[in-house]
A protein has these predicted regions:
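Hydrophobic, well-ordered secondary-structure elements that form the walls
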Residues: 231, 257, 288
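Nucleotide-sugar donor-binding catalytic core of glycosyltransferases
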Residues: 1-74, 78, 82-229, 233-250, ...
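Conserved acidic donor-binding segment of nucleotide-sugar-dependent glycosyltransferases
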Residues: 257-263, 274-278
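Glycine-centered loop/turn motifs
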Residues: 253-255
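A charged, aromatic-enriched C-terminal amphipathic alpha-helix characteristic of glycosyltransferases
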Residues: 278-309
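Generic C-terminal helix-cap and adjacent flexible tail
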Residues: 310-317
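Residue-level signal for the nucleotide or nucleotide-sugar donor/cofactor binding architecture
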Residues: 226, 262, 296
Length: 317
């Protein structure tokens, strides 16, 4: 398939600090001809000099903070091929981004949030829950010793930024864990600071491998980030807060992860149980790994997207 992939800010580079921004692009390149265009776009006339089968706007495109970048693109409709958008950064210019998708008559909305259905209805297009997954070449089982009971790496999202039952959740979990009962790896900093960042994906992935349990919680708008799948693919036990509506049945307590209540009322009990029941822990870890490796890698996401594009292009099939 010939794909025009439109992005911004060189976020598809392997050297970009968030590698998952470019994982779909790199996966699509393996079996398709992908033409990459980076930057704001006003018309398509000068960027497509060969037959294009579809257009994909990547995550980086929706990191732009100028509302003027979310206008109608001249010539896009005239290409008469399926157009897909990976909606991103919902806290910034969300309405402008939705209007961009609407006025450009996109065919497929890819949204990692539970809002994918309502956003698709507003735009008037197909919508797909498109999880931010992980690359099993990086996040994989390693033959390293488990030296931590529990690990975490990421921004704290404190200072009341998140409202409701998950308010200051990561800070609250940390305070609960620093009583000295367990050996923990906790690398975090306040919102807006990148001091917590581990220098390389390899080092970060190894820290997950070195931990028996890894904490991953929903983000500022109850979003599910790639850490969930990074942990599963690493064969470490995923510990996450209980959000059944947002999880849509994908993350199930005692099956492929362990969930705790947002008020932390059962956190100690669950940690004690699984840290002292290795057999039960390993069953969950194996279930999680098999689910992630078979359904939720970036290859799976790329295949899912290409199938949806073919459905849109040839609806009679």
């Amino acid at each position: 398939m010939n794909i025009l992939f439109i992005d911004y800010g060189n976020t598809v580079s392997k050297n970009y600090m968030y590698q998952y921004y470019g994982d779909l692009y790199r996966e699509l390149k393996k079996d398709n001809t992908v033409f990459l265009y980076q930057g704001p776009l006003r018309n398509t006339e000068n960027i497509s000099n060969s037959k294009i089968d579809c257009v994909i706007f990547g995550l980086g495109y929706f990191t732009q903070t100028d509302p003027e970048k979310y206008k109608e693109i001249k010539g896009l409709k005239d290409l008469k091929v399926p157009v897909a958008c990976m909606l991103h950064k919902h806290l910034s210019l969300l309405q402008q981004k939705l209007e961009f998708c609407k006025i450009n008559n996109i065919d497929i909305l890819l949204d990692s949030h539970i809002t994918y259905k309502e956003h698709g209805e507003y735009i008037g297009c197909e919508s797909v829950r498109f999880w931010f997954t992980a690359n099993p070449d990086i996040y994989r089982p390693r033959d390293v010793k488990k030296i931590y009971d529990i690990g975490f790496n990421g921004a704290s999202h404190g200072s009341g930024k998140i409202k409701g039952p998950t308010r200051d959740l990561r800070d609250r979990v940390h305070k609960k864990l620093i009583d000295g009962k367990r050996n923990i790896f906790w690398n975090s900093s306040k919102e807006g600071s990148l001091q917590y960042r581990i220098s390389s994906a390899e080092e970060y992935a190894t820290k997950i491998n070195q931990s028996k349990i890894w904490v991953s919680t929903t983000g500022p708008i109850l979003d599910v980030g790639p850490r969930y799948f990074e942990v599963m693919l690493s064969k470490t036990l995923l510990l996450c807060n209980n959000m059944p509506y947002e999880y849509e049945g994908i993350f199930q307590d005692g099956v492929n992860c362990v969930t705790f209540e947002n008020d932390l009322s059962d956190l100690d009990e669950k940690l004690d149980y699984y840290l002292n029941n290795e057999e039960e822990m390993n069953k969950i870890i194996e279930n999680a790994y098999q689910m992630a490796i078979n359904k939720y890698t970036w290859k799976n996401m790329a295949d899912k997207l290409l199938e949806k594009i073919e459905e849109v292009a040839c609806p009679s099939k």
